[in-house]
Amino acid sequence: MARIFVVSEYVGANQNSTGYYWEKIIGKMQREFGGLTVIFPLTAGETPPVVSPSVDQECFKFPRSNKNRLLSRGLAQIFQAFLFSVKLTSRARRGDVVLSGTNPALLLMTFPLLRYALGFKWVLLVHDVFPENLVPAGVLKKDSIAYRLLRRLFSFIYSSADRLVVIGRDMEALMKEKVNDPRSLVFISNWACEKEVFPVPREDAPFINIPEWKGKRVFQFFGNVGRLQGIENILSAIQLVKNEKAAFAFIGDGALVDSVKKHALEDQCARLRYFGRLPLAEKNFGLAACDVALVTLEEGMFGLGVPSKAYFSMAADKPILAVMEKGAEISRIIDETGIGWNCPPNDPVALARLIDEICELDLSSLGGVPRSVLQQNYSEYISLEKFAACVRPLLSESKI
């Protein structure tokens, strides 16, 4: 009988947003099909992810590396990819179905060979598109030899999967140009669980009950404060905002946190605050701590990623100010549903002007709309049913 394997660096909601989604997928696969095995690493000193006891777990110990040192990180990924491969080789057989993601990238590179050697069916969940995403990150130049070589390599890797699950329609269009058979592509959007993420009054978020912010319109960035999120563009725009009602809250962690902290310290008007990283248990209070959610991507990220924070903000019933290229998945949702506003990336003047305008708007007409859009189109139930529908025919083929 064919079995299902999930192979992922993160498998628990207590780890990060990637772990959140994999935990939900794991639960659905186990309930729908049974016979599920999850292969994942456990870094020294890390809190173990919460995995259902009904799921067969193949966990391997993994030494902690310094993510800020390229050599240390590279060696760690090589070792991790090797351990993943050993575990999968010892368990998976012809006809089994293996689900994996695009990280770590070195593990992704081993899958075409493993699939050929072991004969399993491969479902790849695409959160990141390599090597295109290395260009806006400043790691590679598009006209470099390394980029062209990696593009050919990853086109081969993506084409080796039986099913490619993409999380945005812009990503789907990009991937059609990369793979040999576009019929392998399946669009399944990100989601948020409406039972776990729900609206909370802003005044109930204790950490933003700042006397100076009474009557302010709070714009919030919540999540990964990373290099691909267009952070510098937001910070530049904040300096240009003229409306005195505007206030800005940053919650999260990432490579550009120090830059956010620096701007907060230099902000003489005290309208920019950094609140650190929130525990998962407090996510609803964090999402409540604003009037408008800022969802941003760096210029050049079209088709390369979809911020999951947008779906959580919808569940929390917050309108969205999307700063990204036109036609990107979140920008497209806003155009289709009217749950917010769009602004092009890398244009702080335009962003500041739009923030000034939003500060003068009556937002009461948007009450209930973002959450309703999520419930009707981007609920957990809808997306997980699509995952089951994606895997089911592969299992049926294995029985023949």
Curated annotation (Swiss-Prot):
EC numbers on record: 2.4.-.-
Enzyme class, broadest EC rank: transferase
Domain of life of the native organism: Bacteria
GO molecular function, one term: glycosyltransferase activity
UniProt record, GO biological process: O antigen biosynthetic process
This protein's pathway: Bacterial outer membrane biogenesis; LPS O-antigen biosynthesis
UniProtKB keywords: Glycosyltransferase, Lipopolysaccharide biosynthesis, Transferase
Gene3D superfamilies membership: Glycogen Phosphorylase B
Family membership: Belongs to the glycosyltransferase group 1 family. Glycosyltransferase 4 subfamily.
PANTHER family noted in UniProt: GLYCOSYLTRANSFERASE WBBK-RELATED
Additional observations: The O-antigen locus is highly variable and differs considerably between different serogroups of Pseudomonas aeruginosa.
Name listed for the protein in its UniProt record: Probable glycosyltransferase WbjE
Chain's gene name: wbjE
